[in-house]
Amino acid sequence: MDSQKKDPLYKSFGYAFEGIGTCIKKERNMKIHCAAAILVVIAGVILKISSLEWCICLTLFGLIMALELVNTAVEAVVDLVTEERKPLAKIAKDTAAGAV
């Protein structure tokens, strides 16, 4: 059995939102994605897109934001492991960036 006490669910959500906030504050590409999402929402309101189109937009926003968060996490872990320029570190970072 696991003897460590787990944090309450609300704390887990707090950690998640803290991570998202940090990514938005510190990562240029996340700021670009957020700005693009805002522009798409404005365009969607002006163009009166359908419910299906809103669902598609929201799904894509979520996927892009999630992949950017994963990319940021991969880059942070690689930087934590090594500050040196290594071929495998480059592959890990480039592949994570390519996922976005």
Language model regions located:
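Short, structured helix-loop boundary elements
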Residues: 6, 10, 60, 86-89
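Short, contiguous pre-domain boundary segments
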Residues: 1-5
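Alpha-helical transmembrane segments of integral membrane proteins
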Residues: 10, 14, 31-36, 52-59
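Short helix-capping/hinge motifs at transmembrane helix termini and TM-loop junctions
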Residues: 26, 47-51, 83
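Acidic (Asp/Glu-rich) catalytic motifs at the cytosolic membrane interface
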Residues: 63-99
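Membrane-embedded alpha-helical segments that form the functional core of polytopic membrane enzymes
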Residues: 40-70
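Membrane interfacial helix-start motif at the N-side
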Residues: 6, 13-31, 96, 100
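Hydrophobic, membrane-inserted alpha-helices
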Residues: 18, 36-43
